[in-house]
Amino acid sequence: MVQYAVTLKGGDWTVFRDGEPIEHGMSRSAAIQMAKGLAFEAEEHGDTVELLIQGYYGEMSRRLSGGAED
């Protein structure tokens, strides 16, 4: 399983892969677009993907590959 996350860190939106930052200083929409693209590529290679996206008020949405959502 691979995990991608978009969170607000130090005032910047950051994209993480498996807990490690891979890109920062982005707008929220650009970070989400990047994370979704990376998640799609991972799914294409047969990986199970967890995508976590932080909202503006700190709430987290979670999506697992296959369209499951909490």
Which residues does each predicted region cover?
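Short, mixed-charge low-complexity intrinsically disordered segments
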Residues: E44-D70
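Short aromatic-glycine-(Arg/Gly/Cys) micro-motifs in beta-strand/loop hairpins
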Residues: V2-P21
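A short, charged, amphipathic alpha-helix used as a generic interaction element across diverse proteins
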Residues: M26-T48
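Generic hydrophobic secondary-structure signal
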Residues: V6, V15, I32-M34, L51-I53
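Short, solvent-exposed secondary-structure boundary motifs
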Residues: M1, A30, A42, E69-D70
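Short capping micro-motif at the N-terminus of alpha-helices
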Residues: H24-G25, R63
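Short, surface-exposed beta-strand-loop junctions and turns on beta-sheet-rich folds
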Residues: E20-H24, A31, A68
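Compositionally biased, intrinsically disordered low-complexity regions
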Residues: D12-V15, R28, Y57
